Swiss-Prot record:
It catalyses: cytidine(32) in tRNA + S-sulfanyl-L-cysteinyl-[cysteine desulfurase] + AH2 + ATP = 2-thiocytidine(32) in tRNA + L-cysteinyl-[cysteine desulfurase] + A + AMP + diphosphate + H(+). This is tRNA-cytidine(32) 2-sulfurtransferase. Binds 1 [4Fe-4S] cluster per subunit. The cluster is chelated by three Cys residues, the fourth Fe has a free coordination site that may bind a sulfur atom transferred from the persulfide of IscS. Homodimer. Residues 247-284 are annotated as: Disordered. One of its GO terms (biological process) is tRNA modification. Pathway: tRNA modification. Residues 263-276 have a biased composition (Polar residues). The lineage of its organism: Bacteria, Pseudomonadati, Myxococcota, Myxococcia, Myxococcales. Keywords: 4Fe-4S, ATP-binding, Cytoplasm, Iron, Iron-sulfur, Magnesium, Metal-binding, Nucleotide-binding, RNA-binding, Transferase, tRNA processing, tRNA-binding. It comes from the Bacteria. The thiolation reaction likely consists of two steps: a first activation step by ATP to form an adenylated intermediate of the target base of tRNA, and a second nucleophilic substitution step of the sulfur (S) atom supplied by the hydrosulfide attached to the Fe-S cluster.
Length: 284
């Protein structure tokens, strides 16, 4: 009889299930991939790196991992803490350093969040580094709640129905971004990171600004969750259950007179928590 699982093992199994299904559903990882794993020092990226290595040991295909951290010149950024962690855990790694901190502060108006400018600059640096390092994919640690909050932000403030795709090719075609945690709940990631005692590095630029629109979306979902327990999973399911003929975008529905009534009523949402994929089975 197998020994009972402890909290870490239970969370790891659940998170591996979410990650394995996301990879299988969206073909995020292929045989021979060399994956740059963006590790910021936050709970999400640490968890992603840990889970990817666990999957690497049992995956139906072979792939490489390269942990990469970008030091953007934040005052007091403890790059040595990350390097010590990578060395202790035996991860192949590369540390990048680009002083974008001063540029971000210069280009951001007073009272505004630096997140958008910071993320654009960081993305450009990572894209270039991925090509130089021979990486075929860039893995980012966005989770289920990030996708939901992004969808709501675009809906409420940008007038568009757009979230974060699990897999995205860059405009120039040189890079492919994957989000293996896209099905994983943030609360499970946070608890797992706490139990694993990852050496978390807080973000001084964006993590402490309370009046961000994203924080408002987070609070909104928390309030809705009190009345609708499964609301987060329902919103995630909606992203995989789109009916273009029932929206107003004429590019998606050029012939409305012949639009199908299929999907006009509520249907059973796609289950992102279904049976285990081959990614969750041991490799022979």
């Amino acid at each position: 009889m197998a020994a009972p699982m402890n909290d870490v093992q239970r969370l790891e199994k659940s998170l591996l299930g979410h990650m394995g299904r996301a990879i299988a559903d969206h073909r995020l990882i292929e045989d021979g991939d060399r994956i740059m794993v963006g590790v910021s020092g936050g709970k999400d990226s640490y968890t992603m790196l840990h889970l990817l290595r666990e999957l690497q040991r049992r995956a139906p295909v072979k792939f490489e991992l390269l942990a990469v951290n970008l030091d953007q010149g934040h005052p007091g950024f403890p790059a040595d803490k990350l390097e010590a962690y990578f060395q202790r855990e035996g991860y192949p790694y590369k540390l990048l350093k680009e002083d974008t901190y001063s540029i971000v502060l210069e280009k951001t108006p007073p009272g505004k969040t630096q997140c958008s400018v910071c993320s654009r600059m960081r993305r450009g640096i990572l894209y270039t580094a991925a090509v130089e390092l021979g990486c075929t994919k860039i893995a980012l640690g966005h989770h289920r709640d990030d996708l939901i909050h992004t969808l709501l932000l675009n809906l409420f403030f940008a007038g568009s129905i757009k979230a974060m795709p699990p897999l995205l090719r860059s405009d120039d075609g040189r890079n492919v971004v994957i989000r293996p945690l896209c099905y994983a709940p943030e609360k499970d990631i946070a608890k797992f990171a706490e139990l694993m005692a990852f050496p978390i590095i807080p973000c001084d630029l964006c993590g402490t600004q309370e009046n961000l629109q994203r924080k408002r979306m987070q609070r909104l979902m928390e309030e809705l969750g009190k009345e609708i327990p499964n609301v987060r999973q329902s919103v995630l399911n909606a992203m995989a259950n789109v009916r273009p003929s029932h929206l107003l975008d004429k590019t998606l529905n050029p012939d409305p007179l012949h639009a199908s009534e299929e999907g006009a009523t509520t249907t059973e949402p796609k289950d992102t928590q279904g049976s285990a994929s081959p990614w969750l089975e041991s490799r022979q």
